[in-house]
C-alpha cells in the first residue's frame, strides 16, 4: 500500500492538523506495516505558486532557466507521488475560511489535464479514480452547521477538487471550535483522536 502524507499547517509542533495526520498514518502503519509512506511538509518546503512561465515551459525543458526547470520538476514529482498513492492523508487547517495557500499551491501542481482530469464532449472526467483521501480538518470555530457553514471554503473546496479528479472516497476527520476555549479544544481533539484510534481510518484506507 502506498500512502502519501501531506501536512500544510504553519504552526509546527503546535499544529493540531499535524497531530491528527500523524495519528492517522501511525494507525495505518500499525495495521499495515508494509505501507510505503511518502511525506511532504508543504509549510517547510514552500511550494512555489503557479506562474505563466511554469505553465508554458516546454515538456523537455530544453533552454529553460535552471530555476524554472527545477520548479517544473518539483511539480512533476508531486504529481507522480499523488498518482502513485493509493491513500492520501492531508492535514488541512482552515485559514480565513479556506485552506492554507501552501496546500492550494500543491493542489495546483496536481491539476494537470491528461493526468488527473480531462475534458471531452461529455464534459469533465476525473482520471485519479480509485484513491482514498483522508483529510484532517481543523477549525478555530464551528463551520459544519448553518449559518457559519456558508463560510466554509475549506472542506467544500477539498471535496470539490478531489471529486473533480475522480475521487469519490473522501473522509474528513474534523476537530473544530479549537479557539473557543481550552475545554472545547481538548474535547474536539479527543473526539478526533478517538475516531482514529477506533481503527475506522484503516478500514477506510484499506
Curated annotation (Swiss-Prot):
Free-text comment on the cofactor: Binds 1 FMN per subunit.
Main EC class the enzyme belongs to: oxidoreductase
Annotated positions binding FMN: 15-17, 94-97, 138-141
EC number(s) per entry: 1.6.5.-, 1.7.1.17
Keyword presence, Kinase: no
Pfam name, any one: Flavodoxin_2
GO molecular function: electron transfer activity; FMN binding; oxidoreductase activity, acting on NAD(P)H as acceptor; oxidoreductase activity, acting on NAD(P)H, quinone or similar compound as acceptor
Coiled-coil intervals, chain numbering: none
Keywords attached to this entry: Flavoprotein, FMN, NAD, Oxidoreductase
InterPro entries: Flavodoxin_fold, Flavoprotein-like_sf, FMN-dep_NADH:Q_OxRdtase_AzoR1, NADH:quinone_OxRdtase_FMN_depd
Keyword Flavoprotein attributed: yes
Cofactor(s) listed in the protein's UniProt record: FMN
Reaction catalyzed: 2 a quinone + NADH + H(+) = 2 a 1,4-benzosemiquinone + NAD(+); N,N-dimethyl-1,4-phenylenediamine + anthranilate + 2 NAD(+) = 2-(4-dimethylaminophenyl)diazenylbenzoate + 2 NADH + 2 H(+)
The protein's role, per its UniProt record: Quinone reductase that provides resistance to thiol-specific stress caused by electrophilic quinones. Also exhibits azoreductase activity. Catalyzes the reductive cleavage of the azo bond in aromatic azo compounds to the corresponding amines.
Family: Belongs to the azoreductase type 1 family.
Known partners and oligomeric status: Homodimer.
Name of the protein in its database record: FMN-dependent NADH:quinone oxidoreductase
Amino acid at each position: 500500500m502506498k500512502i502519501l502524507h501531506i501536512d500544510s499547517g504553519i504552526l509546527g509542533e503546535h499544529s493540531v492538523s499535524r497531530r491528527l495526520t500523524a495519528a492517522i498514518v501511525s494507525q495505518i502503519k500499525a495495521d499495515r506495516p508494509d505501507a510505503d509512506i511518502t511525506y511532504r511538509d508543504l509549510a517547510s518546503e514552500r511550494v512555489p505558486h503557479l506562474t505563466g512561465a511554469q505553465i508554458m515551459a516546454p515538456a523537455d525543458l530544453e533552454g529553460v532557466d535552471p530555476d524554472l526547470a527545477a520548479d517544473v520538476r518539483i511539480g512533476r514529482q508531486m504529481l507522480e507521488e499523488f498518482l502513485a498513492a493509493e491513500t492520501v492523508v492531508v492535514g488541512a487547517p482552515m485559514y480565513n475560511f479556506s485552506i492554507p495557500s501552501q496546500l492550494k499551491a500543491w493542489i495546483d501542481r496536481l491539476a494537470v489535464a491528461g493526468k488527473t482530469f480531462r475534458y471531452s464532449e461529455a464534459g469533465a472526467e476525473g482520471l485519479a479514480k480509485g484513491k482514498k483521501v483522508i483529510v484532517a480538518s481543523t477549525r478555530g470555530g464551528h463551520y459544519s452547521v448553518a449559518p457559519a457553514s456558508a463560510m466554509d471554503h475549506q472542506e467544500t473546496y477539498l471535496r470539490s477538487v478531489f471529486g473533480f479528479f475522480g475521487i469519490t472516497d473522501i473522509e474528513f476527520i474534523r476537530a473544530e471550535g479549537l479557539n473557543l476555549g481550552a475545554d472545547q479544544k481538548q474535547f474536539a481533539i479527543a473526539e478526533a483522536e478517538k475516531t482514529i484510534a477506533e481503527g475506522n481510518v484503516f478500514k477506510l484506507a484499506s
